[in-house]
Amino acid sequence: MSIDQSTAAKVAKLARIKVEQDALPALAAEFNTILGFIEQLNEVNVDGVEPMVSVTPMRLKRRTDGVSDGNQQAKVLSNAPDAREGFFAVPKVVE
């Protein structure tokens, strides 16, 4: 696959990058160089290689899903300008 100047201009427009008309040939050449490197990856034999996400084994620590009130009600309501009966009190905005 080869990138021409019109494709390079389209990519620049999609990326919201202003590229002058005289810089398009160089941009197209850079895109072609990048695509060449990517094509080299297609030549690598990866048969039998297990896909991996990280070079170090990482596991997420799991915890049980439990519902709680957070035990923060008094602390949260202390910041409210008006709190009544454990709730935020706000002025009526709809008639």
From Swiss-Prot:
Quaternary structure and partners: Heterotrimer of A, B and C subunits.
NCBIfam families listed in its UniProt record: gatC
Gene (UniProt): gatC
Reactions performed catalytically: L-glutamyl-tRNA(Gln) + L-glutamine + ATP + H2O = L-glutaminyl-tRNA(Gln) + L-glutamate + ADP + phosphate + H(+); L-aspartyl-tRNA(Asn) + L-glutamine + ATP + H2O = L-asparaginyl-tRNA(Asn) + L-glutamate + ADP + phosphate + 2 H(+)
UniProt superkingdom: Bacteria
Species whose genome carries this gene: Ruegeria pomeroyi (strain ATCC 700808 / DSM 15171 / DSS-3) (Silicibacter pomeroyi)
Protein name: Aspartyl/glutamyl-tRNA(Asn/Gln) amidotransferase subunit C
Keywords: ATP-binding, Ligase, Nucleotide-binding, Protein biosynthesis
Enzyme Commission number(s) of this protein: 6.3.5.-
